[in-house]
Amino acid sequence: MTKHLNGALRCVLELFLLLSTISGFAQKKVPAGGIVWNSVGQVYFNPNNGTGQVAGYFTYFPGINDLFTGAPSAGTAHFTFRSDTLQLQPLPAQGNLNVILAGAGVWKVYYNPTPAGDWGSLDSFSEGQVVAVLTHGTKELIGTGAAGTNMFSGDVIATYDFVLAGQTYNLGKIFPGGFTNFSTISNVPSSGTSEFPVGLPSASTAIAKGPEHRPESSTK
């Protein structure tokens, strides 16, 4: 009897170790220059007071599946984001080139088991569990014609474990050294909110930053 119990216990332990190993393979640090996320968002802007926010949802994280509860959309996305309020400063236009400056700040990533994102409600993108608190550097939103671009770098302030489909994840394992985000922004406005009446749709891809210091080269 004892032998059978010991054998069963050994099998349980081996299964646990196997599952732990599989989970570890699912999450690993992305090398510098590798893609750490894709996202869809909207820049919300109030032209009367020059303030704005950015919100949206993620369509890709490496090693994480089941990002949606149905067909991919804002309303089915488990992972959303929202920035703090930004001060936006338009610069004088140069021909058909328009530039808007935005200061550095903080934004958060959320995991919502029961998503209900709605472009008409900023609060719908900040519901659920906070899984990451990130910084963003000074932004320069560059527009020409019907579209524009934006690029910024950021660092990780804090990340928190979350459970999805029975597995525990942490976004800090993917990009612990920070990230650089590249966005394409539509200059054709859409509906915003009562606080930020102008919305500019956007889509982004971010890559992992490299080490802060390169090793010193050796001389022979």
Question: Which residues does each predicted region cover?
Answer:
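Sec/Tat signal peptide C-region and signal peptidase I cleavage site
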Residues: 22-26
